[in-house]
């Protein structure tokens, strides 16, 4: 799902079986992240391909009409992944630029999760860097928005994670004491801070999914 700054996308499709050969070991789990862009997913086939976890888009916002939108496949994907025994988390693609908007979005997420158990918590995905100057917020303000998001969701029983590309994790975000989901499309990342998950390709090929899907490795 990443517009991962200037990191190059994987040039050609990467079969999940190849990814397993490269990255699967006793200390890792291999997974995917999905949204309505993937359409209907055959979760049984996904499980049989060797996928161990899925992070599912719960929604996004705001739209130009200032709406918060539930991903139309969110419930179906969450149920499907859980039915196959995959570990699950969700992510929210946010365009928020005030604490008030963060509060509204955290409530939207909590309301739609409605107590649903998550293994991998809720990820905060802010990538609207092209319009950053229009928002008149500082890097400190952005970090404060994440911290508020995290504290609000923890009150609802959910751990949180920060998603970002290598460039922005190094140059914008304060990653100290945060669970980090790194996006860096390369064979071997040289990102040298702590991270929990690495999204290494946006061109994954997985049985049960039409078209490309993001591939991720989780470190136990």
PLM feature spans:
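Gram-positive cell-envelope targeting signals
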Residues: 1-6
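Aromatic-lined carbohydrate-recognition surfaces of secreted/lumenal glycan-active proteins
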Residues: 157-170
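Short beta-strand/turn micro-motifs composed of small residues
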Residues: 92, 164, 184
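Hydrophobic anchor at the start of a short beta-strand
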Residues: 88, 159-160, 180
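Short, electropositive alpha-helical surface patch
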Residues: 106-114, 173-182
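Substrate-binding cleft of extracellular glycoside hydrolase catalytic domains
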Residues: 24-144, 148, 154-156
């Amino acid at each position: 799902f990443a517009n991962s700054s200037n990191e190059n996308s994987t040039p050609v499709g990467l079969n999940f079986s190849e990814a397993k050969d490269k990255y699967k070991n006793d200390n890792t789990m291999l997974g995917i992240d999905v949204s309505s862009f993937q359409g209907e997913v055959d979760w049984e086939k996904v499980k049989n391909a060797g996928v161990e976890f899925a992070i599912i888009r719960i929604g996004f916002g705001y739209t130009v009409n200032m709406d918060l939108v539930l991903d139309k496949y969110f419930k179906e994907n969450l149920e499907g992944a859980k039915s196959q025994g995959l570990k699950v988390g969700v992510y929210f693609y946010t365009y928020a630029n005030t604490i008030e908007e963060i509060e509204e979005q955290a409530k939207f997420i909590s309301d739609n999760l409605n107590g649903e158990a998550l293994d991998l918590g809720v990820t905060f995905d802010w990538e609207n860097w092209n319009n950053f100057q229009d928002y008149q917020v500082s890097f400190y303000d952005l970090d404060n928005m994440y911290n508020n998001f995290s504290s609000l969701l923890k009150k609802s029983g959910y751990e949180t994670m920060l998603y970002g590309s290598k460039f922005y994790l190094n140059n914008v975000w304060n990653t100290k004491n945060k669970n980090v989901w790194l996006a860096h499309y390369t064979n071997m990342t040289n990102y040298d801070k702590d991270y929990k998950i690495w999204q290494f390709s946006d061109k994954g090929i997985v049985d049960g999914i039409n078209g490309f899907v993001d591939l991720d490795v989780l470190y136990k």
